[in-house]
A protein has these predicted regions:
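Short aromatic/hydrophobic "clamp" motif used to bind/position activated sugar donors
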Residues: 94
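A glycosyltransferase accessory/donor-loop signature
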Residues: 2-3, 152-155, 173-283
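A short, glycine-/small-residue-rich helix N-cap motif at loop->alpha-helix starts
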Residues: 71-78
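Conserved donor-nucleotide/metal-binding helix-loop-beta segment in metal-dependent transferases, i.e.
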Residues: 103-139
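Short glycine- and hydrophobic/aromatic-rich loop-to-beta-strand nucleating segment
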Residues: 163-170
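Short acidic donor-binding/metal-coordinating loop in glycosyltransferase active sites
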Residues: 99-101
Length: 340
């Protein structure tokens, strides 16, 4: 497929960190996306953005579009409006991305022009029993196919993360209408479903996407984990992470003030992150150094309180990395860890 027939679009925001994330996303496409760098690139916003932001994106070859919000009850659903661009943009496949994704390699050869492409999610808050109830509520037949979630390997229906979507042009208009419709219906009825109410308004647009795909009987092709690799969680051993070399990573806003993607649990993936050159080298980024230290000592990513506190000490040179390591070793959390 020729890159000029691919449109890459994201739903941005005038607020940080989303504005900067939008810039990083398109910078990654231009730097590492190969043929994708020549694709049509559009950033959508549901509120006015600064001239500086528009200018920065234009320099990257990105057009900006102002879109109407879907519903004030769920700002995450505004991403659905990306699909409303089909009448003004010429493409064979729409690649819809969240702002907190980064392109590491050219994936154009893996785009299917005839099926919707998406990666199954790492978690499913609903579970099979609640999906049955939800499908019955909307008069839909529960799909027979079963997936396993990547984090805990629980069995569920084909339920997708919508941070990375490949949508063939013939499907875009109809999917847009159905996805939007199920979103509004879910927002109107969510209180009837305790498990949905528990997380409201999160996941609404993701549940509605799954309802739309199955309710609209669209052909879909599950993408591999390499096409939307989450860096914020530890995944099940069946995922065989050591064999993975991702095309796109989904950092879930885990990005340093200097523009470096924070580490995940897997060294082979972190080595891929080391190759991203947007700003200060990761080895000189205080937040990344603290994140590394947490992983080495506490075996988890740094929480925001610890990250901000220790990186500030490091940056101001009030404490060295060795000093901070000693502080962590003296903590109750470290002392409570099982010793190997």
């Amino acid at each position: 497929m020729q890159p000029k027939k691919i449109a890459i679009v994201c739903q941005g925001s005038a607020k940080e960190p989303f504005t900067k994330e939008t810039e990083y996303l398109f910078r990654s496409i231009n730097a590492y996306g190969g043929k994708l760098s020549k694709a049509e690139k559009i950033a959508c916003f549901s509120e006015s953005v600064s001239d500086e932001t528009i200018s920065s994106l234009e320099k990257l070859g990105v057009k900006t579009r102002l879109i109407e919000p879907i519903d004030s009850r769920c700002v995450h659903a505004n991403k659905i409006q990306m699909l409303g661009l089909s009448e003004e943009v010429d493409f064979d496949v729409l690649v819809a991305l969240d702002t907190d994704t980064i392109i590491l390699k050219d994936f154009s050869n893996f785009i299917d022009e005839k099926k919707i492409g998406a990666v199954r999610d790492d978690v499913d808050p609903l579970g099979l029993d609640n999906w049955k109830i939800l499908f019955e509520h909307f008069g839909l037949k529960l799909p027979n196919e079963r997936f396993h979630t990547y984090k805990d390997w629980k069995k569920t229906i084909p339920y997708f993360n919508n941070g990375v979507l490949f949508i063939p042009q013939p499907y875009v208009s109809q999917l847009y209408k159905i996805w939007k419709s199920y979103t509004i219906k879910l927002l109107d009825a969510y209180e009837k479903f305790p498990i949905i109410s528990r997380y409201y308004p999160y996941y609404i647009e993701q549940y509605s996407f799954t309802l739309a795909v199955h309710g609209g009987e669209f052909s879909y092709s599950p993408l591999s984990l390499e096409m939307n690799f989450p860096t914020h969680v530890s995944l099940h051993k069946n995922c065989k992470i050591k064999d993975i070399n991702p095309f796109l990573i989904h950092h879930h806003h885990r990005i340093s003030k200097l523009g470096n993607v924070r580490n995940c649990y897997y060294e082979n993936i972190n080595r891929c992150l080391d190759e991203i050159k947007f700003s200060v080298d990761r080895k000189n980024d205080p937040e990344i150094l603290i994140d590394n230290l947490y992983m080495q000592t506490l075996r988890r990513p740094a929480d925001m309180e610890g990250l901000n506190h220790f990186s500030a000490l490091l940056e101001s040179k009030k404490k060295s990395l060795e000093d901070i390591k000693k502080m962590i070793f003296a903590s109750d959390e470290y002392k409570a860890l099982p010793k190997n």
